[in-house]
């Protein structure tokens, strides 16, 4: 059966994903055979989808893409300025199930971490947790690049002198 987009599909993820007549996302039998259950779980029930206000000084935004497959990932972090702890994380991903799952898992992983600890996360950790096949390792690399870009954006906002009128 071909994937369909209905008004019930999750537009926040911007990926064509199969839904049934009731608008419930379903994983096909082919998907279940090709992906680890953790990928399917994060793909069908992604965590922390959405946006934060990028204009806020304590929000960092990382936007990365993979030219090889066309996946694009935006990950945003909200940081407690006094503690350096990531208080909230949101993502939007245009891409395959592995890219969506990698984004979703990354948001769960970094929430509550310090910026230094979050910057140390490697794609291999994500790939191992989700049991990604070698052909999908670029998806976990996107998640690593996205968190590093978000941290860099947050830090650049903190180091920018303010203009006084």
Swiss-Prot record:
User: Keyword set for this entry?
Assistant: 2Fe-2S, Iron, Iron-sulfur, Metal-binding, Mitochondrion, Transit peptide
Q: Which is a Pfam family this sequence falls into?
A: NifU_N
Q: What is its main location?
A: mitochondrion
According to the record, the signal peptide region is: none
What effect does gene inactivation have here?
Cells deleted for both ISU1 and ISU2 have decreased activity of several respiratory enzymes that contain Fe-S clusters. As a result, cells grow poorly on carbon sources requiring respiration and also accumulate abnormally high levels of iron in their mitochondria. Knockdown of ISU1 in ISU2 knockout cells reduces cell growth, decreases cytosolic tRNA thiolation, and increases association between SSQ1 and GRX5.
Where is this protein found?
Mitochondrion matrix
Which Gene Ontology BP annotations are present?
A: intracellular iron ion homeostasis; iron-sulfur cluster assembly; tRNA wobble uridine modification
Q: What is the effect of changing residue 141 to E?
A: Disrupts iron-sulfur (Fe-S) cluster assembly
Which GO terms of the cellular component aspect does the record hold? cytoplasm; iron-sulfur cluster assembly complex; mitochondrial matrix; mitochondrion
Region annotated SSQ1 binding region, chain positions: 132-136
Pathway assignment: Cofactor biosynthesis; iron-sulfur cluster biosynthesis
Is Cytoplasm one of the keywords UniProt gives this record? no
Q: Which CDD domains match?
A: IscU_like
Subunit note? Homodimer, but can exist as monomers or trimers. Oligomerization may be regulated by Zn(2+) availability. Component of the core Fe-S cluster (ISC) assembly machinery. Interacts with YFH1/frataxin with a 1 to 1 stoichiometry; the interaction is direct. Interacts with the mitochondrial co-chaperones JAC1 and SSQ1. Interacts with NFS1. Interacts with YAH1/ferredoxin; interacts with the reduced form.
Instruction: Give the miscellaneous note.
Output: Present with 10800 molecules/cell in log phase SD medium.
Role summary: Scaffold protein for the de novo synthesis of iron-sulfur (Fe-S) clusters within mitochondria, which is required for maturation of both mitochondrial and cytoplasmic [2Fe-2S] and [4Fe-4S] proteins. First, a [2Fe-2S] cluster is transiently assembled on the scaffold proteins ISU1 and ISU2. In a second step, the cluster is released from ISU1/ISU2, transferred to glutaredoxin GRX5, followed by the formation of mitochondrial [2Fe-2S] proteins, the synthesis of [4Fe-4S] clusters and their target-specific insertion into the recipient apoproteins.
- What family is reported? Belongs to the NifU family.
Q: What name does UniProt use for this protein?
A: Iron sulfur cluster assembly protein 1, mitochondrial
In its UniProt entry, the species of origin is given as Saccharomyces cerevisiae (strain ATCC 204508 / S288c)
């Amino acid at each position: 059966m071909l994937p369909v987009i209905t008004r019930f599909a999750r537009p926040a993820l911007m990926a064509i994903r199969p839904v049934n007549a009731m608008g419930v996302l379903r994983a096909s039998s082919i998907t279940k055979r090709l992906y680890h259950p953790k990928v399917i779980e994060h793909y069908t029930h992604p965590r922390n989808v959405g946006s934060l206000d990028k204009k806020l000084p304590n929000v960092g935004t990382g936007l990365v893409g993979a030219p090889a497959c066309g996946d694009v990932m935006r990950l945003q972090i909200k940081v407690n300025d006094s503690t350096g702890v990531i208080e909230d994380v949101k993502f939007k991903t245009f891409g395959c199930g592995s890219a969506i799952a990698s984004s979703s898992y990354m948001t769960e992983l970094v929430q509550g971490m310090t910026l230094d600890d979050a910057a140390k996360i490697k794609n291999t950790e994500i790939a191992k947790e989700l049991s990604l096949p070698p052909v999908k390792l670029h998806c976990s690399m996107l998640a690593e690049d996205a968190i590093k870009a978000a941290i860099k954006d947050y830090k650049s906002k903190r180091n920018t002198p303010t203009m006084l009128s």
